[in-house]
């Protein structure tokens, strides 16, 4: 089962959940992920112990996290 989370002021919000083969849930998760990218969020997924930025929802990932870009001065 995969989960799509957005880091926010509450800590995190679960945006989507899907299981392999559930095409409707996968399509909803992809649409949600793409909408959040359009809002300027950055997606990352952890595979093999290393996190990487993703621009497409990896449906084989257990956890994908969306966050705002880090800005500093």
State where each predicted segment sits.
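Ubiquitin-like/PB1-type beta-grasp interaction modules and other compact soluble beta-rich domains
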Residues: 1-71
